[in-house]
């Protein structure tokens, strides 16, 4: 792969909206990605392998639970800082950002928000350093966009819970030390359980033959009469709203992350267009290529403003689920279109591993699907503005 020469576009001087801390956090993540991710990620994607050696580096830049209070091992940063870290990591690779998103928003977040003090003290510091890695079990083979229909269940056996069922499309599953598992009790109420690797009956087979997120480990969670200690139930919240609150945090991070992928594709296409000579001049001097580049930077700028405003609302505790959903849908859609246009601008070179664009393009096909599909997010917006659910 070619050297990482990335220069971030900032057409509307958005840096002026950021604090010094925001810029320090972002720049640290950006330099780490250039140094540790860019040189190796294409090789790991080609091999369909997650680069475990970067886990410590991810922890060092604050990618694991940056908004978690310092008393639990987090950095105590705000939501804009979290978004900027996700942006920079996804600029490197969506699969690596997925690993970070899951650890932060889908594992550490529910333990912090819904767990007991004992659970927070036991798990959060080790998750923050990457000593423990986690995964999040919600999606099932027959229940994707309809998680309320889940069949994974647990029974009260007196001194423990007995957990049965299966989850699929689970990022980090093959190597996770703990899993946040959402299951129904005997009354049909959804609760979150912390399931540890090594518990008899708990297995995590890996999912192979992916064309997308190849540098991210994906698997299943299988529960065959798993005995879960009662102290591993998170008591702070139950019902579908609990995992949905986690997904709000993850979707927010994705809204920022997608900008990173788009910026990388735009920057690559712009540099290539200035250097590639056809018909005795750079292709950047043609109307068609300028149109593409102008549209790219316009859409990136709009997405940056949307994410920044959403970050302000998150910091103020005012952001709604529907607002987060809109940003996730819009920004991922923006990124996938930019990736496709950038790929065309590079011609045949665009499909090679010398450039990051094709990898981004394939990865974004997953990003536009997970944490709520593209169409489901439209229905969330539709329900919010009309007051009428169209899910059934």
Kindly give the residue locations of the regions a language model identified.
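Alpha-helical interface subdomain recognition
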Residues: 1-102, 114-119, 126-131, 146-147, ...
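Long, acidic (Asp/Glu-rich), low-complexity accessory segments flanking structured domains
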Residues: 224-242
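Helix-loop "lid/cap" segments that line or gate small-molecule binding pockets
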Residues: 105-113
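Flexible, small-/acidic-enriched active-site or ligand-binding loops
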Residues: 149-150, 198-229
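Short Gly/Pro-enriched turn/cap motifs at secondary-structure boundaries
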Residues: 127, 142-145, 169-172, 184, ...
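A short, Trp-centered hydrophobic/proline-enriched beta-strand micro-motif
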Residues: 130-138
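Short Ser/Thr-interspersed hydrophobic loop/turn segments at strand-loop and sheet-helix junctions
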Residues: 62, 86-90, 183-185, 195-200, ...
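A short core secondary-structure module
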Residues: 159-160, 164-204
């Amino acid at each position: 792969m070619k050297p990482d020469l990335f220069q971030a576009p900032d057409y509307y001087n958005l840096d002026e909206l950021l604090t010094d801390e925001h810029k320090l956090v972002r720049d640290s993540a950006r330099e780490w990605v250039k140094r540790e991710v860019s040189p190796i990620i294409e090789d790991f994607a080609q091999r369909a392998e997650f680069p475990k050696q970067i886990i410590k580096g991810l922890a060092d830049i604050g990618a694991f639970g940056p908004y978690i209070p310092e008393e639990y091992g987090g950095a105590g940063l705000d939501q804009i800082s979290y978004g900027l870290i996700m942006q920079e990591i996804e600029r490197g690779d969506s699969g690596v950002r997925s690993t970070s998103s899951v650890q932060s928003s889908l594992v550490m977040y529910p333990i912090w928000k819904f767990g007991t003090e004992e659970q927070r003290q036991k798990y959060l510091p080790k998750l923050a350093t990457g000593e423990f890695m986690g995964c999040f079990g919600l999606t099932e083979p027959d229940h994707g966009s309809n998680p309320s229909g889940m069949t994974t269940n647990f029974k009260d056996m007196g001194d423990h819970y007995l957990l049965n069922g299966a989850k699929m499309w689970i990022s980090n599953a093959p190597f996770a030390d703990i899993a946040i598992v959402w299951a129904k009790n005997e009354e049909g109420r959804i609760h979150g359980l912390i399931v540890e690797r090594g518990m008899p009956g708990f297995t995590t087979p890996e999912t192979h033959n992916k064309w997308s997120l190849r540098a991210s480990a994906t698997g299943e969670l299988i529960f065959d009469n798993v005995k879960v200690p009662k102290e591993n139930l998170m008591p702070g919240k139950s019902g579908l709203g609990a995992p949905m609150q986690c997904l709000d945090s993850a979707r927010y991070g994705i809204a920022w992350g997608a900008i990173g992928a788009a910026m990388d594709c735009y920057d690559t296409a712009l540099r290539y267009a200035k250097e590639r000579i056809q018909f005795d001049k750079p292709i950047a001097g043609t109307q068609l290529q300028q149109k593409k580049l102008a549209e790219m930077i316009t859409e990136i700028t709009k997405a940056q403003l949307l994410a920044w405003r959403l970050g302000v609302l998150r910091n103020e505790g005012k952001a709604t689920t529907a607002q987060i959903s809109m940003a996730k849908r819009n920004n991922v859609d923006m990124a996938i279109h930019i990736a496709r246009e950038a790929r065309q601008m590079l011609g045949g070179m665009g499909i090679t591993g010398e450039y990051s664009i094709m990898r981004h393009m394939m990865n974004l096909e997953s990003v536009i699907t997970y944490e709520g599909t593209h169409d489901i997010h439209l229905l969330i917006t539709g329900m919010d503005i009309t007051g009428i659910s169209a899910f059934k």
